[in-house]
Swiss-Prot record:
Compositionally biased region (Basic and acidic residues): 136-153, 164-174
Biased composition range(s): Acidic residues: 8-23
CC annotations in GO: 90S preribosome; nucleolus
Alphabetical UniProt keywords: Nucleus, Ribosome biogenesis, rRNA processing
One example of a Gene Ontology biological process annotation: maturation of SSU-rRNA from tricistronic rRNA transcript (SSU-rRNA, 5.8S rRNA, LSU-rRNA)
Protein name, per record: Ribosomal RNA processing protein 36 homolog
Biological function: Involved in the early processing steps of the pre-rRNA in the maturation pathway leading to the 18S rRNA.
Family: Belongs to the RRP36 family.
Disordered: annotated span: 1-29, 62-89, 136-188, 218-247
Biased composition (Basic residues): 218-240
InterPro entries reported in the protein's UniProt record: RRP36
Residue stretches in coiled coil: none
UniProt superkingdom: Eukaryota
Amino acid sequence: MDNQLSDSSDDESPTDDCSDEGEVEHLKDELSQIPFCELQDLKDKIGSKKYNLAIHGIMEERTQGIPDLETKKKKNKGPQELSSKQRVPKLRKVVQVKKKMGRDPRFDDLSGKFNEDLFRKSYSFVNDIRVEEKKSVEKELKKTKNAEKRKNLNDLLKVMNQQERSRKSAEAKRESKKKIKETERELVQKGKKPFYLRKSELKKLELAEKYKELKSKGKLQKYLTKRRKKTASKDRRHVPERRQVDQ
């Protein structure tokens, strides 16, 4: 009896598979011309399994044994469980380690405060190197006959001269401030209240010191003429142009 049932079940399974395949092929032909809303109704009627086989060719039997990677909850409100198929990360953080941050000792508070005077004294040799470089450029300029190379050397020499003037100007300002601070410090020691100069007053003192230096070198008149021309050109830019009236 059991053998007969098993034989009958074995006989039925191939025919069922064939009927399913025939039904799928038949559905494929018909579904290509059906609107989406009707397809959705059809999916509700025949079930998602046969619908997916017909439309997308997805074999649901192949994917039944593969669990989802997302966490699942038991129906009895148990704890979440992870699938054994989930890939383990390559680098697992067992112990949280504090991220190392780069540290520049030049700008770190642990290295102390910046001493400008000490810095300039320590790197005073850089100015000597600049002087030697300027001399070598001037020598090269005298020897060179190539027009393009001479132009490049002239441009480089102008930049060097401009940088040198800027350094000297900054140095003169530092010296002026230093003298004012020393004078004020001496007066405070004698009992005077501390007095701090405004920026405008400090600028006037720096300008007076600059005029004094230029006068000693005989360049004051040239500097004043150049400054007047520069001021006049600035004023000219703000003057409105004269309108031409057609006669």
